[in-house]
Amino acid sequence: MALINNVQCKYRLIHILQVPQTKAKNGEEVTGLLAVCSYLAQLSSNKQHLLGTNPEERASVQQWVEYLQLSVDRCASNHESTNTVLKELNLYLKDRVYFVGNSLTLADILIYYSLHPTFAALSFQDKEKYNHVSRWFDLIQHDSSIRQHLPLLVFSKMMLYEKHR
């Protein structure tokens, strides 16, 4: 009886917390953001690049998904947390094109989707403060297969404001 209650509790929590889930080809439920995204990426013809091309990259993709869940997704309603996360991401992307390796990965796609509402609300001046993450965001959004239904956000090509020293 305890097992049934635990299973029922699990499914209630999944529903309440809106945890992503899907049904695998074999009929099994796949639950959790990383699990669902990894499963779908495995089905892709581009799975090696999406999940990482070596063990270090695969671990890094997983770390970024955890960071996304712990930091990025939790700061949407808090201006100070949003600034902190954008500063961290901006510093990280200073000398990188993508979050992991030299090509687009699941980390880039998920972070893009998570940051889209934030970037949609930023002014040009705010976008310029986070120039490296803005450059990365603009690169990712121009892949229409990733952007899909989301609106294309406008980024200025020139500095419009004087940087504060």
Model-derived features with residue positions:
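Short acidic/histidine-centered micro-motifs embedded in hydrophobic/aromatic stretches
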Residues: Y39, W64-Y67, Y112, W136, ...
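C-terminal helix/juxtamembrane-tail motif
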Residues: S145-R165
